[in-house]
Amino acid sequence: RSPSRGLGYVYKRQLWEWSSQGKLPVVIDAASCTHTVVDSMPEMLGESDRERFARLRILDSVKWLRDAAVPHLPITPPRGKIAVHPPCSGAHLGNTEALIELANVCGEAEVPVGTACCGTAGDRVMLHPELVESATREERESLARGHYDHFVSANRTCEMGLEMIAGKPFESIACLLERASRPSQVPL
């Protein structure tokens, strides 16, 4: 594991302040970043900073959306069939079911056959697209057969890699939820 070099600084100088010394949750909108912060940050910190870190509530956006936002959103009728790509980092966080639940709020969620780690690994899709091509072969075939209306995930690099390799417009589940919660337009 090689966490971002600036992660320790960000924690020490920013997360503590932004969270009002642990009173507000820290919501991270990228499963791989949430996983890194939750899993790697404590070992990078000194004893007093570890104690502070333990008082922070670090939440991935998927669980925050499901538990805190969706109950208050006026969701419009279903928006069709939704291909869901659960990121592997989200699986490590235990977020897969929450991601599927969010997609089901918006329409008919389905995890395509063959969905596993997309192989994007941060910027690797830009440098080695063959990794993603190989890792997603079965998923891409399933996407082509699935007749989906929407394509969602919970990690921007996965979305970018899948869009680039599969040619499907993957986006964050948060974007689909935003559209599904817009007020219905009354025809003139």
How does the language model describe each region?
Residues 8-188:
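Iron-sulfur cluster-binding electron-transfer modules in prokaryotic oxidoreductases
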